[in-house]
Regions:
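N-terminal periplasmic/intermembrane-space "pro-region" immediately following the signal or transit peptide
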Residues: 2-8, 17-101
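Signature for the C-terminal beta-barrel architecture of outer-membrane proteins
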Residues: 52-54, 74-75, 133-137, 143, ...
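Tryptophan-centered motif/residue detector
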Residues: 57-67, 91, 180, 199, ...
Length: 449
């Protein structure tokens, strides 16, 4: 037995001594690959150039592991904050259009008043982002965004100076649309970011701020879904390619102290491919009682977004959702203020028995022309069978082609042409209920400061 044991030892030593160098190299390579697999990448290379596109990453922010610190815009530099984590900056966004409608472009949003020049948005941000790249210590941050302009009416939340819209139907107003704190915990999962306060609804390709959108106008499906939530949202990084979001809030577009507020939950997941050329982001954006309460929506929402990069020149993003709520009124949340020429759909609509539903879908197709230019083609669809979202029981489509040009890192223009129409017989939603379809040619100018 001792001789056999000695023979086995000598055989092992001999095999090691006479092993082919290529075998040793393969073993080392295998070990290196295994170590690489076990290492979580904090962030992947961004799939898109920004500028000219409004973002360099797919939908589903915040992205843990990426540096979210804002660039040093002119106001930040003027205030001597270039070397600080705190950034103070903003933008101004006037726009104009030529429309086949005379008084109102509704249900189109963010381009409401036809054949005139208007101040869509002036925004100001106070922005301090936590450091989620590191994995050593807890990090804190916050974000505050306030806007003034005609676009306030879309982000207005009941209980946040909302009488400007809900009580008066004002043309211009302001809204503190984002006010939240951030806490980053590096040791929970592969990093967890907790957001507490008022924040943008995480779903959607399109965004509330002019600076964050491919085009000047918005799709009809974006117009009628949730804009902001107030509550808490936790984002978990799970490896290199997954994130999970869990949240609780007071319902879409209302403060917790509003008498319409109801508890809603959120559960969303984000996946990207290993080359970051594909992304899927979706789940439950809002789920609760879903009871329309005290003349205000409580929208429930299932949503999914797919981003795909064909090559350096072409990419697209596609989104679809299903909305529902109970005991709603035609037209949704009630504006009790006086009718204005640009928006006459005020007062309580007729009750909708049972469940109100809506289905939306949109596709964005982008063509990179140069480092400062791109073309965006958008095709959207909205089904509003009971009129709970637009005030008219019909389905719609909207079709837009836009060209975006950056003069420099701070100034861009976004001209576009658009056609949209309703399909139900005898239904005329456009120009205050007088037309079945609408043509517009519009443009805005974004100046960052």
């Amino acid at each position: 037995m001792k001789k056999l044991f000695a023979l086995l030892i000598l055989s092992g030593i001999g095999a090691q001594a006479f092993a082919h160098p290529a075998d040793s190299a393969r073993i080392k390579s295998l070990n290196a690959d295994t170590a690489k697999i076990r290492t979580v990448q904090r962030s992947l290379p961004s799939p898109l150039p920004d500028p000219p596109f409004p973002t360099s990453d797919w939908d589903g922010a915040p992205l843990i592991g990426s540096d979210a610190t804002a660039p040093n815009y002119p106001l930040t530099k003027l205030l001597g904050l270039s070397n600080s984590r705190l950034k103070i900056y903003g933008w101004i966004d006037p726009g104009a259009d030529i429309s086949s409608s005379k008084n109102s472009n509704a249900p189109t949003s963010y381009d409401l008043i036809p054949n005139t020049v208007m101040l869509d948005q002036v925004g100001i941000k106070f922005d301090l982002q936590p450091n989620t790249v590191q994995t050593d210590h807890v990090s804190f941050g916050f974000l505050s965004t306030t806007i003034f302009g005609t676009d306030y009416r879309y982000t207005t939340g009941k209980g946040y100076f909302s009488n400007q819209l809900l009580g008066n139907n004002n043309k211009y107003g302001f809204d503190p649309a984002e006010m939240y704190g951030l806490i980053y915990f590096p040791k929970i999962a592969d990093g967890m970011l907790l957001k507490i306060g008022r924040y943008i609804s995480p779903a959607d390709i399109e965004a509330q701020w002019a600076t964050d959108n491919y085009l000047y106008s918005h799709s009809l499906m974006f117009t009628v879904d949730p804009y902001t939530f107030t509550g808490a949202q936790a984002t978990f990084k799970l490896g290199s390619y997954w994130q999970l979001e869990v949240g609780v809030d007071a319902g879409n577009d209302m403060a917790p102290w509003s008498k319409s507020a109801q508890i809603n939950g959120l559960l969303m997941a984000r996946w990207v491919s290993h080359d970051n050329n594909n992304s899927i982001y979706g789940g439950i954006n809002a789920l609760g009682n879903g009871d329309y309460t005290r003349q205000h929506d409580d929208l429930q929402m299932l949503v999914a977004t797919w981003g795909h990069k064909f090559n350096k020149t072409f990419h697209m993003m596609t989104e679809a959702y299903y909305l529902w709520q109970y005991h709603a009124l035609v037209g949704g949340t009630v504006i009790t203020g006086p009718p204005q020429p640009f928006y006459t759909n005020v007062g309580a609509g007729a009750p909708i028995p049972g469940t109100m539903t809506a289905v939306g879908a949109v596709n964005y197709f982008q063509i990179l022309v140069s480092k400062r230019d791109y073309i965006s083609i958008r095709n959207g669809y909205l089904s509003d069978p009971q009129g709970g979202r637009t005030g008219y029981a019909t389905s719609y489509s909207d079709h837009t082609i836009g060209f975006v040009h950056y003069f420099n890192d701070y100034i861009r223009i976004r001209p576009e042409i658009r056609y949209e129409r309703a399909y139900a017989d005898g239904i005329t939603p456009y120009d205050n209920g007088t037309k079945k379809d609408q043509y517009t040619a519009g443009m805005d100018l974004i100046v960052r400061f």
